[in-house]
């Protein structure tokens, strides 16, 4: 069937066979299908949708467009975690050592930041000397020896997704649920883990803005994973407000270490404990209550922090900075952002905060941009807090000539009010193959 006919079929609301999806996806990877044809087909998917079975087949075709990682040399159940992204989303650096300290093997591939959201690999590389590009042999050997490793995603994984994502980004088809689900799950299936916990963020700082849409996406991804024989669960977490107080690479590492030392912010600690609990449940470590107790215990006895240091040391990192934060690269300058009036912070748009941190140099506006590891923002006041005029809302770190533009961006997402806004939950729901449990 010609690509023209396949575009027309989806435009008219038809359902594709696996063979047709292979023609589209593999043709795009090989260059037989052009960008403009793929863009037309993806817009047809955006407007007409896909059945769950069709999306599961698309995911598998995308996964098989590149390397399929075989984790069988690592014994036991391997559990992975994926976040759909957010501002100040530093949970991976906390939960991976917690779960590994409880005896579960973690062989995780993570990404870099793009747009207003940060990436785990960038954060890890702010620890001097840390290597995130390991060979497969080094990766497996480290996981077998110490129980965990987090590395950058291989260029060879889900090749179709890389091309399709870049095209979606410039054709207004990013927020299409079947295309988001197949993008995420193709990488997860190709990465080889037995069980996957998805952290589906929702709100202003996330790509999906409503709880209802986030649940729809989570159900579809759980269905895809189950269809392919993986254990999958998804938590719907709030991203209207950044987790914790720090946004920026080394700043987020410091805050993550504080959680592992038992002195982190309450919101970040709670979300990390819930994520770790569900990963342990997927790994058959016990009931939710037993797994929660295990996660709390490895923070309390210091073994989770020790496991984190062990991982950084194995990957060449200078672990002294994890104990003494003054050894991190220091910012060139700092700036206090002051409240312009009295009142409650009714809105503090997380996407605007993330964009402000990018302007400071903590993130990338385009692929390949250099990062300032010391740049970022520390929040002193968050949504729901009362502030007095002249009080510090946040401290900016970076190069002085970037402060004005970042402050303008930050303030554009700030709304004051006379009434304290209602509190939003940290976690909205847990989605499994058995259904949706609302919190």
Residue map of PLM features:
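Phosphate/diphosphate-binding glycine-rich loops and adjacent basic-rich segments that engage nucleotide
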Residues: 144-193
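Alpha-helix C-terminal capping segments
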Residues: 47, 93-105, 187-192, 224-228, ...
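Gly-rich Lys/Arg/Thr-decorated short loops/hinges at beta-loop-alpha junctions or inter-strand turns
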Residues: 3-5, 120, 161-169, 202
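General beta-strand structural signal in soluble alpha/beta enzymes
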Residues: 106-110, 132-135, 150-153, 197-200, ...
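Acidic, glycine/proline-rich low-complexity segments that act as flexible tails and inter-domain linkers
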Residues: 1-88, 307-318, 433-434, 439
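Glycine/serine-rich anion-binding loops at beta->alpha junctions
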Residues: 77-100, 104-116
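A glycine-rich helix N-cap at a beta->alpha junction
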Residues: 123-149, 219-225, 229
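Well-ordered secondary-structure scaffolds
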Residues: 5, 17, 28, 68-69, ...
């Amino acid at each position: 069937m010609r690509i023209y006919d396949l575009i027309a079929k989806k435009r008219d609301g038809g359902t594709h066979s696996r063979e047709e999806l292979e023609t589209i996806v593999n043709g795009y990877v090989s260059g037989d299908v052009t960008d403009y044809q793929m863009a037309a087909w993806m817009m047809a998917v955006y407007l007409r949708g896909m059945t769950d079975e069709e999306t599961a087949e698309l995911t598998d075709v995308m996964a098989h467009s590149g390397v399929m990682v075989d984790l069988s040399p690592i014994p036991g159940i391997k559990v992975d975690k994926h976040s759909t992204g957010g501002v100040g989303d530093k949970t991976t650096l906390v939960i991976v050592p917690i779960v590994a300290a409880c005896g579960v093997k973690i062989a995780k591939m993570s990404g870099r930041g793009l747009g207003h959201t940060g990436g785990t690999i960038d954060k890890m590389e702010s620890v001097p000397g840390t290597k995130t590009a390991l060979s497969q042999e080094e990766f497996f050997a480290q996981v077998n020896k110490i129980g965990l490793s987090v590395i950058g995603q291989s260029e060879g994984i889900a090749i179709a997704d890389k091309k399709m994502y870049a095209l979606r980004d410039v054709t207004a088809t990013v927020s299409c649920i079947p295309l988001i689900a197949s993008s995420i799950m193709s990488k997860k299936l190709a990465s080889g883990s037995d069980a996957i916990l998805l952290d589906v963020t929702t709100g202003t700082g996330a790509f999906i803005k409503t709880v209802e849409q986030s649940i729809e996406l989570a159900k579809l991804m759980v269905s895809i994973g189950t269809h392919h024989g993986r254990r999958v669960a998804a938590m719907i977490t709030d991203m209207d407000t950044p987790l914790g107080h720090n946004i920026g690479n080394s700043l987020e590492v410091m805050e993550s270490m504080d959680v592992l030392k038992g002195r982190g912010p309450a919101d970040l600690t709670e979300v990390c404990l819930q994520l770790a609990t569900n990963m342990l449940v997927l790994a058959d470590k016990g009931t939710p209550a037993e797994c929660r107790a295990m996660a709390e215990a490895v923070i309390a006895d210091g073994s989770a922090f020790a496991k984190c240091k062990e991982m950084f040391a194995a990957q060449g990192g200078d672990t002294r900075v994890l104990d003494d934060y003054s050894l991190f690269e220091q910012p060139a300058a700092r700036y206090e952002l002051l409240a312009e009036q009295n009142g409650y912070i009714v809105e503090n748009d997380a996407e605007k905060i993330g964009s402000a941190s990018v302007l400071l140099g903590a993130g990338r506006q385009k692929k390949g941009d250099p990062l300032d590891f010391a740049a970022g923002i520390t929040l002193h006041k968050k949504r729901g807090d009362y502030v007095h005029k002249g009080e510090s809302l946040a401290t900016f770190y970076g190069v002085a000539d970037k402060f004005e533009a970042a402050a303008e961006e930050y303030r554009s997402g700030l709304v004051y009010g006379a009434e304290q806004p209602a509190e939003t939950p940290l976690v909205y729901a847990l989605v499994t193959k058995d259904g949706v449990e609302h919190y």
